[in-house]
């Protein structure tokens, strides 16, 4: 019965030390569309919100599947949209990046670079990039991991 959800930054500290502004996700996309200006109809943000709502549905009530975001503590500030893991054991096991369109080379390099950096930092061996309609599998050099690029509609149809 929440209208807006707040997504905290991943931290292994008992006391949250992040000064980052948490991400906010509105459950009712129709309301967001109605009250936002025409130039703020960002498809990427709307896709990210839809993915968040599906993750909330899949993980509700489970301690071992906490959803957070993650920003690398480096000068590049590489970000992953969703990090899923065990809250008490501080063990991340899933990384999800959301991108509406990976057709632009700069966007593709940014999304893959961020996901690869966080995968190495968190010791997660696979990552997921959800798009509007693109799909492929990307093997990292030296068998360090795999990216799966999936259309978000197909991912939403998979069982949790």
Regions found by a protein language model. Give the residues of each.
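Short Gly/Pro-enriched loop/turn and capping motifs at secondary-structure junctions
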Residues: 89, 101-104, 134-136
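Short, hydrophobic beta-strand segments that form beta-sheet elements in well-ordered domains
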Residues: 125-131
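Accessory nucleic acid-recognition modules appended to NTPase machines
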Residues: 1-92
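Structural motif
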Residues: 92-96, 126
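Domain-level recognition of nuclease-like catalytic cores that cleave nucleotide substrates
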Residues: 132-160
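A short, acidic, amphipathic alpha-helical segment used as a generic capping/interface helix at domain edges
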Residues: 78-80, 110-116
């Amino acid at each position: 019965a929440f209208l807006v959800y707040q997504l905290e930054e991943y931290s292994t500290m008992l006391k949250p030390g992040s000064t980052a502004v948490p991400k906010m996700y509105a459950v009712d996309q129709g309301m967001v569309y109605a009250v936002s200006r025409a130039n703020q109809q960002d498809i990427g943000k709307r896709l990210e919100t839809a993915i968040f709502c599906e993750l909330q549905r899949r993980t509700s009530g489970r301690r071992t599947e906490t959803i957070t975001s993650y920003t690398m503590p480096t000068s590049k500030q590489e970000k992953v949209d969703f990090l899923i893991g065990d809250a008490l054991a501080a063990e991340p096991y899933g990384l999800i990046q959301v991108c509406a369109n990976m057709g632009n080379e700069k966007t593709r390099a940014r999304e893959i670079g961020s996901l690869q950096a966080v995968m190495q930092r968190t010791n997660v061996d696979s990552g997921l990039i959800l798009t509007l309609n693109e799909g492929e599998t990307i093997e990292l050099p030296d068998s360090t991991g795999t990216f799966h690029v999936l259309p978000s509609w197909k991912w939403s149809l998979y069982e949790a």
